[in-house]
Amino acid sequence: MFRLTPQAEADIEEIALRIAADQPAAALRWWEGALEKCRRIGEMPRIGVARPEVRPELRTLPFGNYLIVYREIEGGAEIVTVTHGASRWQDLLRP
């Protein structure tokens, strides 16, 4: 089981819309792939890399050029944000 935070929902939508501006079919594939990766994370929440240097509970898993940031919760995972791998996402999530 996985759930998306409002931020993660907005991130996925924004990325898909950006891709769709030039390549609608690619955007649909990306969106479907992102949700499938989130499902896998929900089934195996320890699959990603632990990120204690940012926050003790956070993990990350790459998806293409993007990084899915999540935390393990009872019964699965909560997707916190989806960001480009080259971004300084750590700075946004530090307490």
Could you describe each region identified by the protein language model?
Residues G42-E43:
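Short proline/glycine- and basic residue-enriched helix-capping loop/turn segments at helix->loop/beta transitions
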Residues M1-W31:
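Arg/Lys-rich, positively charged N-terminal/basic patches that mediate binding to nucleic acids
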Residues L28-R29, V49-R51, D91:
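Short, hydrophobic secondary-structure boundary micro-motifs
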Residues R3, P62, E78:
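Conserved beta-strand segments that form the floor/walls of ligand-binding pockets within enzyme
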Residues R46-G75:
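Basic/aromatic recognition patch in beta-strand/loop cores that engages polyanionic ligands
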Residues Y66, R71-P95:
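Enriched for short, Lys/Arg-rich terminal
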